[in-house]
């Protein structure tokens, strides 16, 4: 720690002489404006509504036609098949991960809906959904649910480093990002 320097008697007398006639300021603090909320903070009510809206697309009765041979994959008709190839090769690395282990089908649908809503809100293009092996219920249902959602562009069985055949890499269609307007 730095050693304090002491003033000589002469310097102290000079200081008192210079400060004679001054008075104490009543208030010398600056009041700052309250910080504005972060843009990414979303009210809880809105999050719950987004989650419910996103899980609305998942039906157990509708069975989309998916290729049953080879790895699990899907590409929306208006999306290039090259995107699925890039997913397979691991060109996209997921920014969000969802683990469905131990969830019921209803909970899994809600969590998938929340994941897609979060990806769109946070402008995340690629996510990983880990459904696991288990009794193969979620493993079979997850691709069927994802293929029904309009914001899912493509998905492919994940490479080994992201879970292999117990996980899917999902490409999400995100809105174009616009910077927030300043007040």
Swiss-Prot record:
* Stored InterPro entries: Smr_dom (IPR002625), Smr_dom_sf (IPR036063), SmrB-like (IPR022990)
Disulfide bond positions: none
The biological processes this protein is annotated with in GO are: rescue of stalled ribosome
What's its EC? 3.1.-.-
Q: Does the keyword RNA-binding apply?
A: yes
- Per UniProt, residues of the Smr domain are 98-173
Query: Which SUPFAM superfamilies has this protein been placed in?
Result: SMR domain-like
- Annotated keywords: Endonuclease, Hydrolase, Nuclease, RNA-binding, rRNA-binding
User: From the UniProt record, which GO molecular function terms apply?
Assistant: RNA endonuclease activity; rRNA binding
The protein's role, per its UniProt record: Acts as a ribosome collision sensor. Detects stalled/collided disomes (pairs of ribosomes where the leading ribosome is stalled and a second ribosome has collided with it) and endonucleolytically cleaves mRNA at the 5' boundary of the stalled ribosome. Stalled/collided disomes form a new interface (primarily via the 30S subunits) that binds SmrB. Cleaved mRNA becomes available for tmRNA ligation, leading to ribosomal subunit dissociation and rescue of stalled ribosomes.
- Give the family this protein belongs to, as stated in its UniProt record: Belongs to the SmrB family.
Q: Tell me, how does this one assemble? A: Associates with collided ribosomes, but not with correctly translating polysomes.
Protein's UniProt name: Ribosome rescue factor SmrB
- Encoding gene per record: smrB
